UniProtKB/Swiss-Prot annotation:
The gene is dppC. GO terms for molecular function: transmembrane transporter activity. It is found in: Cell membrane. Keywords: Cell membrane, Membrane, Peptide transport, Protein transport, Sporulation, Transmembrane, Transmembrane helix, Transport. One of its GO terms (biological process) is sporulation resulting in formation of a cellular spore. Coiled coil: none annotated. The lineage of its organism: Bacteria, Bacillati, Bacillota, Bacilli, Bacillales. Pfam families: BPD_transp_1, OppC_N. This is Dipeptide transport system permease protein DppC. It is a multi-pass membrane protein. Probably part of the ABC transporter DppBCDE involved in dipeptide transport. Responsible for the translocation of the substrate across the membrane. The keyword Transport applies.
Length: 320
């Protein structure tokens, strides 16, 4: 007996369907949440951005720019020649005609101050550049080679570092005679030692990084690796050291001038002018010492605060 086949004709249950867009993530909002708000900046741009936030360092930078500009155009702003003498205008105080007064020979102190700025700043910058060239090459090779070569090169540095700096400079000045070139040579004989030690320490830290090892693997020569891979990553410390070398050289030149071993007449530097003006303080001629000493102090202060600012700005650990 065939039983009738019962078919389930029940309709499928109707469920309330949730719109698909409810389950779609808001990609735009997630993308905004995951994105970094800080703009992409290069190392140099980021360092400049942080340096601009340091008001003291920026003040030092503007002071130095002012001094360098005045060293170029300052002597031309005065109608008086740097070597012109006038026995009727001896030791005149600052006035509308002589803005910084005159010296014992009637020469305009304003003109001589900015002419002396050329020599003082030139000595400082040249000493820093020579220290940079010698110190970077010497320290870079010592740090990169390592081993016995590094030990020998560092023993030489220790010997030079142990010598009395000013004694060596004075001895060279006596042997070679006074002059601008002699001063620069004397200041750089041992002045590069500090730069070499800093560069060596930086190179020792980064010479085993992957990109340096890759250059070695592809057969790059030592000086190419130092120039292309190592030096660009040590420039922060090098620049800071140079900003400290310049005022040190200016101060050393001023000290030598106080000892009578500086620039010879009729030329003048800030140190020579300060040395000439020192005995006149008791006579009431204060301006002869004040202006050169003031600009020496201002230059050293500006370089030091700029160096501190650059040290903070160029430090990769401080990047945000």
């Amino acid at each position: 007996m065939n039983l009738p086949v019962q078919t389930d004709e029940r309709q499928p249950e109707q469920h309330n369907q949730v719109p698909d867009e409810w389950f779609v993530l808001n990609q735009e909002k997630n993308r905004e949440a995951d994105s970094v708000k800080r703009p992409s900046l290069s190392y140099t741009q980021d360092a400049w951005r942080r340096l601009k936030k340091n008001k003291l360092a920026m003040a030092g930078l503007f002071i130095l720019l002012f001094l360098f500009v005045m060293a170029v155009i300052g002597p031309f702003l005065s109608p008086h020649s740097v070597v012109r003498q006038s026995l009727t205008e001896q030791n005149l105080p600052p006035s509308a005609d002589h803005w910084f007064g005159t010296d014992e020979l009637g020469r305009d102190v304003f003109t001589r101050t900015w002419y002396g700025a050329r020599i003082s700043l030139f000595v400082g910058v040249m000493a820093a550049l020579i220290d940079f060239l010698i110190g970077v090459i010497y320290g870079g090779v010592a740090g990169y080679k390592g081993g016995r070569i590094d030990s020998i090169m560092m023993r030489i540095i220790e010997v030079l570092y142990g010598l009395p700096y000013l004694l060596v400079v004075i001895l060279l000045m006596v042997l070679m005679g006074p002059g601008l070139g002699t001063i620069i040579v004397a200041l750089t004989v041992t002045g590069w030692v500090g730069m070499a030690r800093i560069v060596r320490g930086q190179v020792l830290q980064i010479k085993n990084y992957e990109y340096v090892l890759a250059s070695k693997t592809f057969g790059a020569k030592t000086f190419r690796i130092i120039r292309k891979n190592l030096l660009p990553n040590t420039m922060g410390a090098i620049i800071v050291q140079m900003t400290l070398t310049v005022p040190a050289a200016i101060f050393a030149e001023s000290f030598l001038s106080f000892l009578g071993l500086g620039i010879q007449a009729p030329f003048a530097s800030w140190g020579v002018m300060a040395n000439d003006g020192l005995p006149t303080i008791l006579s009431g001629h204060w301006w002869r010492l004040f202006f050169p000493a003031f600009f020496i102090s201002l230059t050293m202060y500006a370089f030091n605060v700029l160096g501190d600012g650059l040290q903070d700005a160029l430090d990769p650990k401080l990047r945000r």
